[in-house]
C-alpha cells in the first residue's frame, strides 16, 4: 500500500509540475502536436526542465543524499531514451513496439494508442495545456520509480 501511495504522489507531483511548465507556453501548443505551427521549447530550456523535474522528484522522495544524484542521473537517462523512442523513432522500427511512426499517422489516429503511452496520455489529458514532451518525461520518471519501488520495498 505504501508503494502505491508513493507512486501516486510522484505522478500527482509530476502532473502539477507539468501543468505549471505548460502554463508558460501557448494555450494551443498541444491542440495539434504534429502541426508545423506548434511551438516547442528551445532545447536548452527543455533539458533544464527535465533536470529540474528529476531533481525535485528525487529530493522529495529520497531527501538530500548521494542517492538523490544517482537516481536523478538514472531518470535523466530513462526519460531521454523514452523521449527518443517516442518522438524520433524511424520508420524501420517495429510497429508492435511503439505503434505507427508519428509522421505516418492520419489526423484521426490517436497519439496515445500504444501501451507505452498510457501514463503519458493520462497526464496529458488531465493537463491539456501541458506539452506532450512533459508527459513523456513524466512517463519515464514514473517507470523508473515503479522499478525502484518494486525492487526496494
Regions found by a protein language model. Name each.
Residues 2-153:
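Catalytic phosphate/metal-binding cores of nucleic-acid and nucleotide-processing enzymes, i.e., regions
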